[in-house]
From Swiss-Prot:
Cited Gene3D superfamilies: Aldolase class I (3.20.20.70)
Protein name per UniProt: GTP 3',8-cyclase
EC nos: 4.1.99.22
GO biological process: Mo-molybdopterin cofactor biosynthetic process
Cofactor note text: Binds 2 [4Fe-4S] clusters. Binds 1 [4Fe-4S] cluster coordinated with 3 cysteines and an exchangeable S-adenosyl-L-methionine and 1 [4Fe-4S] cluster coordinated with 3 cysteines and the GTP-derived substrate.
Record's subunit section: Monomer and homodimer.
Record-linked Pfam families: Fer4_12, Mob_synth_C, Radical_SAM
Binding site for [4Fe-4S] cluster 2: 252, 255, 269
Cofactor list: [4Fe-4S] cluster
Keyword Amino-acid biosynthesis attributed: no
Catalyzed reactions: GTP + AH2 + S-adenosyl-L-methionine = (8S)-3',8-cyclo-7,8-dihydroguanosine 5'-triphosphate + 5'-deoxyadenosine + L-methionine + A + H(+)
Chain positions recorded as S-adenosyl-L-methionine binding sites: 21, 64, 115, 189
NCBIfam families per UniProt: moaA
Length: 328
């Protein structure tokens, strides 16, 4: 198993979208109250005095939608300037990004992933649960702003939903030809909206790669990320194509991450809540950071056994939160 040195940090569970694959349709979510969220000071204490000492040095800020977090630019700056931070990135839906991109870059953020599940405005609005004025154009402006500012790599995340956006695979892949953008196709998975998954199912990465291979050809890329994506390239393209195959190919043995929820729960596996630790309550009750370090070390030792490997047998993992509440 890889060294676990990568922490995904959910800054907030609220989101200004309601994506089909992330939140169950028609279900009211119990959002975390403000006083239950980790404060910036608590989060920085945990990063400096717990996570870094046990070996974490790469951090990704997620949500909900992380740009809804008050003082998010200040938080980015504080994490980026820690001498032990080797990598700081963010995943966003891009809706609020355009006016914030330069400030985020100036604060030290260099890598960004933006969700772009469709190039068609109507399909996009259907996926994000938008009922009013289309939000596609504002997200596209956010992507263009991130590109202009200099974020590199700039990655576009696509969750492939059968019968909804799977007909756009070639159009989305073509974005990598003329720009140094990295499009990542993510297999739809049964967390966040189990009913939709049951209705729609999923398309394997192998099928997507074959579509692209038949159109342009496809080669393995020399660019290799630190995450679970298998990276390929259209011959002659400036960017790359990543395939995250959590349904068709179990990559538990290469998992290098844990997840910290906005209310302070440290979770060892996306698909399994077993073993998770309530760091916020412990910190607020006076538990020393040395004791918290030991708890995290124990969870790190347990992680290979906790990583969920039951998909092949059709077993569903143990989880009670939606994808938006976990942070993806």
């Amino acid at each position: 198993m890889n060294q676990v040195d990568y922490l995904r940090i959910s800054l907030i569970d609220r989101c200004n979208f309601r994506c089909q694959y992330c939140m169950p349709e028609g279900v009211e979510l119990d959002y975390i109250l403000k006083q239950q969220l980790l404060t910036n000071e608590e989060l920085l204490t945990l990063i400096r005095e717990v996570f870094i000492p046990v070996g974490f040095n790469r951090f990704r800020l997620t949500g909900g939608e992380p740009l809804l977090r008050p003082r998010v630019v200040d938080l980015v700056s504080a994490i980026a300037t820690l001498p032990q931070t080797q990598d700081l990135s963010m995943t966003t839906n891009g809706f609020l990004l355009a006016p914030m991109a330069q400030n985020l870059y100036n604060a030290g953020l260099r890598r960004i992933n933006i969700s772009l599940d469709s190039l068609d405005a109507d399909t996009f609005d259907q996926i994000i649960g938008n009922q009013g004025r289309s939000r596609w154009q504002q997200v596209w402006h956010g992507i263009q702003a991130a590109h202009s500012v200099g974020f590199d790599p700039l990655k576009l995340n696509v969750v492939v939903i059968p019968g909804v956006n799977d007909h756009e695979i070639l159009d989305l892949a073509a974005l990598t030809i003329d720009k140094q953008w990295h499009v990542r196709f993510i297999e739809f998975m049964p967390i966040g909206n189990v009913d939709l998954f049951g209705d729609r199912g999923w398309v394997s990465s192998a099928e997507l790669r074959q579509q692209i291979r038949d159109r342009w050809g496809l080669t393995e890329s020399q660019v290799r990320g630190a995450g679970p994506a298998d990276v390929f390239k259209i011959p002659g393209a400036k960017g790359t194509l990543g395939f995250i195959s959590q349904m068709s190919e179990c990559f538990c043995d290469r998992c290098n991450r844990m997840r910290l929820s906005a209310d302070g729960w440290l979770r060892p596996c996306l698909l399994n809540e077993t073993g998770q630790i309530d760091l916020k309550t412990a910190l607020r009750s006076g538990t020393s950071t040395a004791q918290l370090q030991e708890q995290v070390r124990h969870l790190l030792r347990m992680k290979p056994e906790i990583n969920f490997k039951g998909r092949d047998s059709g077993i569903v993992g143990t989880y009670t939160r939606t994808m938006s509440q976990i942070g993806g």
